[in-house]
A protein has these predicted regions:
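Membrane-embedded beta-barrel scaffold of Gram-negative outer-membrane proteins
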Residues: 243-245, 251-267, 430, 436-446, ...
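Extracytoplasmic beta-strand/coil segments of soluble accessory domains associated
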Residues: 30-77, 95
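C-terminal beta-signal and adjacent terminal beta-strands/loops
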Residues: 493, 538, 549-550, 604-619, ...
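Short strand-turn segments of transmembrane beta-barrel domains in outer membranes
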Residues: 103-105, 115-151, 160-162, 169-171, ...
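Transmembrane beta-barrel wall of Gram-negative outer-membrane proteins
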Residues: 137-166, 171-208, 230-248, 317, ...
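Gram-negative outer-membrane beta-barrel transporters
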Residues: 297-299, 372, 487-498, 513-614, ...
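Short acidic/polar hinge/loop motifs at secondary-structure boundaries
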Residues: 73-101
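Face-selective signature of the C-terminal outer-membrane beta-barrel domain
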Residues: 191-200, 234-397, 430, 489, ...
């Protein structure tokens, strides 16, 4: 348990950020999450501005299949309709990152991926003021500055930081600058009650070099043929939290949170990666997100006979109103996010949508200690969801000279109202003092999102029969420690995924044109064995020398998958599920002598597909989906991180992609592509704290 949360019988992992030797300034995900098992990661984002993680066959794009939170409240654009995370807290500000797999659907939402919760550092309770400054420089003009101030004054405490980051990236037409502020202000009303307020402001602007075809990547992965593509994000989060302890056995928490945010994408974005930018008007898409919610939790400890028990009940209210507009942007080169539809009446991509959402949830879990060793934790979540999509897409018809003939406005008005009950159960059995057998089963649900139902491209079709995705997750494993020599967690999982949605489905329409349809493609079954082990070699080899630190770690996921039912005329029956490498391994050494510490990590992922048909890459670079559809080749990458501490000073340095391997982890269907997004080559960084 943690406050008013229950984790008994669940697959849980915690990243202790302060103990990491990693490139925190650039938010290098494979290093920070190196011991979180089975994650599939997109590596193509310069500066680590966004978090892109998936696992167990879930698309890593902007971590949309996880419920992402900070200090227990939602931070994504729209939890149901647009669960993408454009904002990610800087790792330097975090004490830990909590990851709970699919069984988190009962307490935190319905997602298949589970929960990722970023816990910020707490105010320093022993000082009135504490100032920490971290300055980083690195390859490709990377400059990052992180500064925090913290302290306690009687009943009042605070933690604030400001983070600035800029750089250029390794490809032409790549640059970014970001600013993040977070303020935490806490007041102790009594020895049983405290209240705090948090505000987060995040803003970044990035120039995007576009994607590549397979042939372009093989010839030169550093090239760019997009000079006018820009991406801008503005994020404002607020939260008020009340915590009250009624007694030593009963605790209550209440979060009241809200979001006011926007994301703007501007550039030349054609379906064919090889299409050259003519320097005319650009496509502009602006999404505005406004949502608010409240979540209350009550946890109480009680007895059933002689055995302890714990009950948790909670409820959540969430309301969102989001707007999206697409149209012509200026025919200039810079980041001017202004619509100029009147100036370019023949621009072919124009749409306007509103997406109101309403969500009510009630949930509960109870830990029953059957014996001193065995506990069972059943739970439920009742959901009421109402999602709407109202708007239109304008089709433009021109003559051969490009003159406007007519327009056809396609109206969309979709309302989807549903309520359902999700059930789950977990169990834990104490095999030994420090070893536990655990198991859990939980139903999952993924709502149709805005991207699933809005048309932004004349070549796109939305199925009239599109349905929500449903399924369940099950885990069975053993975890524990052995005499301070070995820490381990070995488990098997099964994920059953019905009505899986994909946009990478091609059909030929009545005019013999190739078009992409967003539809439910079938039912997927995913099975895997996940292992995390950490061996304390110091205890074995250098037991008498307390100045030495030496640990060997292994993080492996062996996964198999298959579409067991096809909704597309049996086209995908027996095919492998996309976004799943059958072998996913991260291993390495953490070493140190006195105040000198370091780590070296090796990562390997086998080949994976990015569409349900398991398509091979297009040999013809002029094909409509060349660079967008195809396999993701196997790749490996090695990282080295070092640090030295002297009194209040700390020096960090490292090399990312030590072997300078050329690889990619993403074939983007839209921004930041479309096409292959190459990962960074060998880079260096140095941080002074």
């Amino acid at each position: 348990m943690d406050g008013t949360a229950i984790y008994a019988g669940k697959k849980t992992e915690v990243v202790a950020v302060d103990l990491l030797d990693a490139n925190l300034a650039s938010n290098v995900t494979r290093q920070i999450y190196g011991q979180v098992v089975g994650l599939n990661i997109y590596d193509g984002g310069a500066g680590g501005l966004q978090l892109n993680i998936g696992g167990r066959g879930l698309d890593p794009n902007r971590s949309a299949n996880f419920n992402t939170r900070q200090n227990g409240y939602d931070i994504s654009a729209d939890v149901l309709g647009y669960p993408e995370s454009y904002y990610t807290p800087p790792p330097e500000a975090l004490s830990e990152i909590q990851v709970v797999r699919g069984a988190a659907s009962l307490q935190y939402g319905t997602q298949f991926g589970g929960l990722v919760n970023f816990k910020f550092k707490s105010p320093n309770p022993n000082k009135k003021i504490e100032f920490i400054s971290r300055q980083t420089v690195g390859s490709y003009d990377l400059l990052a500055s992180f500064n925090s101030i913290s302290g306690t004054l009687g009943k009042f405490s605070y933690y604030n930081y400001f983070n600035y980051k800029e750089g250029k990236g390794f490809r032409p037409n790549t640059s970014f600058n970001s600013r993040n502020y977070h303020g935490h202000f806490e007041y102790l009303l009594s020895d049983k009650t405290k209240i705090w307020f948090e505000a987060t402001i995040s803003d970044y602007l990035a120039q995007q070099p576009g994607g590549l075809t397979d042939a372009q990547f093989q010839d030169d992965p550093t090239i760019s043929i997009r000079e006018r593509n820009w991406f801008d994000v503005s994020w404002l989060l607020g939260n008020v939290r009340l915590e009250h302890r009624f007694s030593n056995s009963t605790e209550f928490s209440l979060n009241l949170f809200g979001l006011d945010a926007s994301r703007s994408a501007l550039g030349f974005r054609e379906n064919r990666v090889l299409s050259l930018d003519p320097g005319e008007e650009r496509e502009l898409l602006i999404d505005n997100f406004q949502n608010w919610g409240t979540e209350a939790r009550l946890l109480t400890r009680y007895k059933i006979g002689q055995q302890d028990a714990v009950a948790l009940i909670g409820s959540k209210y969430y309301q969102a109103f989001n707007r999206q507009r697409q149209g012509a942007g200026p025919a200039t080169a810079g980041p001017d996010f202004s619509f100029v539809d009147e100036e370019f009446p023949t621009f072919a991509r124009r749409s306007t949508y509103t997406f109101p959402n309403l969500n009510l949830a009630f949930f509960g879990e109870n830990i029953f200690n059957i014996t001193n060793r065995l506990s069972i934790t059943p739970g439920f979540r009742f959901e009421y969801i109402k999602t709407q999509g109202v708007g239109n897409f304008t089709r433009v018809f021109t003559d051969l000279a490009g003159n406007l003939i007519s327009t056809d406005i396609q109206e969309e008005d979709r309302t989807n109202e549903r309520s359902f009950l999700l059930l789950g159960i977990g169990a834990a059995y104490q095999l030994a003092k420090q070893t536990e057998l655990y198991a859990n089963f939980s139903e999952n649900f993924r709502s149709i999102t805005f991207n699933d139902i809005r048309i932004v491209n004349p070549a796109q079709i939305i199925s009239e029969d599109l349905e929500d995705e449903t399924g369940f997750t099950a885990d069975l494993g053993v975890r524990g420690t052995v005499n301070d020599l070995l820490r381990f967690d070995v488990s098997g999982f099964m994920l059953y995924y019905s009505n899986r949605i994909s946009a990478n489905n091609q059909i030929i329409d009545e005019f013999n044109r190739v078009r992409n349809i967003t539809d439910n493609v079938g039912t997927a079954l995913i099975l895997g064995i996940e292992t995390v082990a950490d061996i304390n070699l110091k205890k074995i080899l250098f037991q008498a020398n307390n100045d030495i630190k030496l640990n060997l770690f292994l993080n492996s996921a062996l996964t198999t998958s298959e579409y067991i039912q096809s909704d597309l005329n049996n086209a995908i029956d027996g095919q492998k599920v996309e976004h799943i490498p059958e072998v996913n391994i991260k291993t390495g050494l953490r070493f140190g002598y006195k105040n000198f510490l370091g780590s070296i990590q090796y990562s390997y992922l086998s080949e994976q597909f990015n569409d349900p048909l398991n398509s091979e890459p297009f040999s013809d670079s002029t094909a409509p989906n060349a660079g967008i559809i195809g396999t993701l080749p196997a790749y490996d990458v090695m990282d080295l991180s070092l640090s030295y501490t002297y009194k209040n000073w700390r020096l960090e340095a490292g090399i990312n992609n030590l072997l300078d391997n050329s690889y990619f982890t993403q074939r983007a269907t839209g921004y930041p592509g479309p096409g292959i997004i190459p990962a960074e080559p060998r880079t260096f960084y140095t941080t002074l704290q």
